[in-house]
């Protein structure tokens, strides 16, 4: 999570900008805070950030907590902050059958997206099991064992509900 190393990322991005390189921050947003000290450091980072890619795993707070062990309030606060401060963003959603693909979840994300003034892209990322071998090597039970990958029809349905075409042609 790059926001855990905000000072380093700020300096790295500053160097990149001096070289004319576009900067993108890919974040879960779960460390975002409205604390004054945090905000000062965060604003400095945003001064050298061109785009923020924000992963929103679930709109429902209880579901988000179940999936990640964390509240989703900081993530939603970050989305609103980016929109209110004119910072371009992409929102990404991993589509996990039976967990993040309900109509209620997707409509909630769609409604948030409609409010975001700086949203440039809304992506549906189909859940996959490519990293399953890592869990097996660690001898740890995979928490999503037995969950199928979404079908092309599942992804198309989610994209339709989310109205991705409104954002992905910008």
Placement of each model-derived feature along the sequence:
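Conserved AdoMet/S-adenosylmethionine-binding subsite of the radical SAM
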Residues: 2-125, 130
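Glycine-centered secondary-structure boundary/capping sites
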Residues: 69-72, 136-141, 166
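C-terminal accessory region of radical SAM enzymes
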Residues: 88, 153-170
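A structural motif corresponding to the C-terminal lobe/cap of the Radical SAM core domain
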Residues: 111-114, 120, 136-161
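Class I S-adenosyl-L-methionine
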Residues: 129-137
């Amino acid at each position: 999570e790059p926001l855990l190393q905000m000072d380093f990322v700020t300096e790295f991005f500053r160097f990149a900008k001096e070289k004319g390189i576009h900067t993108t921050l890919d974040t879960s947003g779960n460390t975002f805070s409205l604390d004054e000290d945090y905000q000062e450091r965060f604003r400095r980072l945003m001064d050298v950030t061109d785009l923020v890619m924000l992963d929103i795993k679930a709109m429902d707070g209880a579901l988000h907590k179940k999936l990640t062990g964390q509240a989703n309030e900081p993530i939603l606060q970050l989305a609103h902050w980016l929109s209110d401060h004119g910072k371009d963003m992409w929102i990404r959603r991993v589509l996990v059958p039976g967990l993040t693909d309900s109509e209620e979840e997707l409509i909630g994300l769609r409604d948030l997206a409609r409010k975001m003034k700086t949203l440039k892209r809304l992506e549906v990322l189909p859940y996959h099991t490519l990293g399953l071998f890592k869990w097996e090597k660690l001898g740890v039970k995979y928490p999503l064992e037995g969950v199928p990958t979404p079908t092309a029809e599942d992804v198309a349905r989610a994209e339709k509900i989310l109205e991705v075409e409104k954002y992905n042609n910008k």
